[in-house]
Amino acid sequence: MPGDCLFCRIAAKELPAKFVFENERIVAFADLHPQAPAHVQLIPRKHIASTLEVGEEDRAIVGELVQTAAGLARELGFADDGFRLVFNTNGAAGQSVYHLHLHLLGGRTFRWPPG
């Protein structure tokens, strides 16, 4: 774990976060600056900087992130209305924390194309 990685520190519970799910491989917590009424970050406990660094050995964890996000959308009550899942990769796409994270956004109507 890189010592300066914000999300590694959250996953290790060195920094506070409102956890909505956790297991031995991933954690999910409420976004500190939500962009929708429901905005959850899902991250692997293993440090992976971005989608560009997802290796063959990481394929299962990416699938688990997506499956867990769908389950949380159901639990939080907005799955039937619809929700958005987003991986941002690198600066021009809006990635500000270089630890793989999946945004789960729901509770409002989204437009296309996104911002």
Task: Name what the model sees in each region.
Residues M1-G115:
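HIT superfamily nucleotide-processing domains
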